[in-house]
């Protein structure tokens, strides 16, 4: 077998349908849209259900968006193990390490085990995270 002898497997390639190019093309006259009616004419907008009350209006409105909500990037204790012993961990260093996407507000949670003595600076800490960091000989600082 040579490169010029390679052919695509049967049924894997289709030529595009040239719609509305004469009756003998098989896609002429009504172009696969059937006879008359709404669907044979222009477009029907997304979500339109033919006059029936659409789903997005049948479902009740719920809740609201709290404008004072603060989003925190979450970091767990096992993620802090990648820093050197005695290092100072800040939101900027967490971003450089790839643990958070933005160096904004960070909350440290207590999942996993911390094996190193670190000084951790973050916006918030869970009680278990503070206990684990201090048990490892480190310090926590709310910024």
From Swiss-Prot:
GO terms for molecular function: rRNA binding; structural constituent of ribosome. The keyword Ribonucleoprotein applies. One of its GO terms (biological process) is translation. The keyword Glycoprotein does not apply. GO terms for cellular component: cytosolic large ribosomal subunit. Residues 1-47 are annotated as: Disordered. PROSITE patterns: RIBOSOMAL_L15. Residues 23-35 have a biased composition (Gly residues). Transmembrane segments: none annotated. Keywords: Ribonucleoprotein, Ribosomal protein, RNA-binding, rRNA-binding. PANTHER family: 50S RIBOSOMAL PROTEIN L15, LARGE RIBOSOMAL SUBUNIT PROTEIN UL15M. Belongs to the universal ribosomal protein uL15 family. Binds to the 23S rRNA. Part of the 50S ribosomal subunit. This is Large ribosomal subunit protein uL15. It comes from Lactiplantibacillus plantarum (strain ATCC BAA-793 / NCIMB 8826 / WCFS1). The gene is rplO.
